Amino acid sequence: MAKKVQKKLPRRKEEFTYHGYKIDELRAMSLEDLLPVMPSRARRKVLRGWTIGEEKLLSDIRSNGSRIRTHQRDMIILPEMIGREIEIYNGKEFIRVELQPESVFHYLGEFALTRRRVTHGSAGIGATRSSKFVPLK
């Protein structure tokens, strides 16, 4: 009569792969070896060359700086950046973002949104015709 209760095992998170490459394999590749793996938009940006700001950001990441703040929203997330915390400027403040393996070859700006959703409140007194005659307290 006693039923055996099976414990649900936690789901095993599979290791992230990008086009069949694990993140460690992507990190070991040189930039020239990464080009065929990249999406075309990221590949064209890399082939154009880095700007001065992007080169500075890459050197900061490679030098293991503890706090990295940047305005370079159009920088491609490279495999060597994965696992780092970067603060990205959204026009008003710096948004702290931890770069996950799933974000490889995306732009930094995709993770620090510049606009927020508008939440309208209720209408004020006198805003509608029916609320003109509501007695004020």
UniProtKB/Swiss-Prot annotation:
Highest taxon in the source lineage: Archaea
A GO-annotated cellular component: cytosolic small ribosomal subunit
A Gene Ontology biological process term: translation
This protein's record includes keyword rRNA-binding: yes
Keyword Lipid metabolism recorded: no
Sample GO molecular function, one term: structural constituent of ribosome
Keywords: Ribonucleoprotein, Ribosomal protein, RNA-binding, rRNA-binding
InterPro entries membership: Ribosomal_uS19, Ribosomal_uS19_euk/arc, Ribosomal_uS19_SF
SUPFAM superfamilies per UniProt: Ribosomal protein S19 (SSF54570)
Protein family (similarity comment): Belongs to the universal ribosomal protein uS19 family.
Described purpose of this protein according to its UniProt entry: Protein S19 forms a complex with S13 that binds strongly to the 16S ribosomal RNA.
Protein name (database record): Small ribosomal subunit protein uS19
Annotated organism of origin: Methanospirillum hungatei JF-1 (strain ATCC 27890 / DSM 864 / NBRC 100397 / JF-1)
Classification of source organism: Archaea, Methanobacteriati, Methanobacteriota, Stenosarchaea group, Methanomicrobia
